[in-house]
UniProtKB/Swiss-Prot annotation:
Pfam families: NDK. Keywords: ATP-binding, Cytoplasm, Kinase, Magnesium, Metal-binding, Nucleotide metabolism, Nucleotide-binding, Phosphoprotein, Transferase. InterPro entries: NDK-like_dom, NDK-like_dom_sf, Nucleoside_diP_kinase, Nucleoside_diP_kinase_AS. One of its GO terms (biological process) is UTP biosynthetic process. It comes from Cellvibrio japonicus (strain Ueda107) (Pseudomonas fluorescens subsp. cellulosa). Signal peptide: none annotated. This is Nucleoside diphosphate kinase. Major role in the synthesis of nucleoside triphosphates other than ATP. The ATP gamma phosphate is transferred to the NDP beta phosphate via a ping-pong mechanism, using a phosphorylated active-site intermediate. Its EC number is 2.7.4.6.
Amino acid sequence: MAVEQTFSIIKPDAVKNNHIGAIVARFEKAGLKVIAQRMLQLTPAQAEGFYAEHKGRSFYDELVAFMTSGPVVVQVLYGENAIALNRELMGATDPTKAAPGTIRADFSMSMPANAVHGSDSPISAAREIAYFFPTHEVVVR
């Protein structure tokens, strides 16, 4: 298995409902390390840039509005098979279809307020990490 980095966002709904610690604990319990983390309020321009690949899709405007509705926590996670492991921990994108015990099943109820975002590939992880974190802010421990 490869040791790799992945990108995660704890979304406004989970931040508002004080689930940050519980979500980070899930990552750490599964063996992922948080090697960079920051809380911020996304601007519309930041959200539009981050989700540019979805521009023109039916959910894009709602997603941008939601992601700018409150603070988010952006993170870089590190560990064995980090991308796949994080996606497994998150569960299905639609919380109503997420398996019991996954982050989305336990901490969210609807779309797009589904608690977390995670990279879906090594290419996405590299792009998403670079969007929010300069290289010197990502410290492997």
